[in-house]
């Protein structure tokens, strides 16, 4: 009975977390890979960025991967990017590729198509050289850290 109750609580927590994420961004890092922080994901230089308040460390604490629970010592890193000239965007950068793949596995079905992007859905983004955000057109499977089924 205690185990069943625990499973219900865990499942409800997962549902709340998955439905309360306002935006998920995938961005290409600028500059050579060896000059990038530990947050670089995949050989293609993509990173996964969650807006502060949606992808806080506690939100994905102990996130399970295909290899078991995440054991990365510091799976999140605070990052800031300039979205517009007058606005700095803050978010959590996932440093653990396994966690990024797992997150995309869970959130993939909820990603908003580019034509239907809204603040209440998920959004795939890439960074232009100027630093402005644009909606990416690549399918999820083309990213360097393709999520596992």
Curated annotation (Swiss-Prot):
Tissue expression as described in the entry: Expressed in fetus (aged from 7 to 8 weeks). Weakly expressed in lymphocytes.
Protein name: Protein GR6
Organism the protein comes from: Homo sapiens
């Amino acid at each position: 009975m205690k185990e069943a109750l625990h499973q219900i609580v865990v499942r409800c927590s997962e549902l709340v977390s998955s439905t309360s994420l306002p935006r998920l961004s995938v961005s290409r890092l600028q500059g050579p890979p060896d000059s990038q922080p530990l947050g670089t994901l995949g050989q293609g230089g993509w990173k996964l960025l969650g807006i502060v308040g949606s992808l806080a460390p506690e939100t994905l604490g102990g996130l399970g991967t295909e290899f078991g629970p995440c054991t990365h010592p510091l799976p999140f890193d605070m990052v800031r990017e300039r979205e517009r000239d007058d606005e700095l965007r803050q978010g959590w950068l996932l440093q653990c590729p396994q966690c990024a793949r797992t997150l995309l596995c869970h959130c993939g079905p909820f990603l908003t198509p580019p034509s239907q992007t809204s603040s209440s859905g998920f959004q795939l983004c890439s960074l232009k050289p100027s630093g402005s955000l644009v909606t990416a057109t690549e399918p999820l499977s083309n990213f360097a850290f393709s999520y596992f089924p």
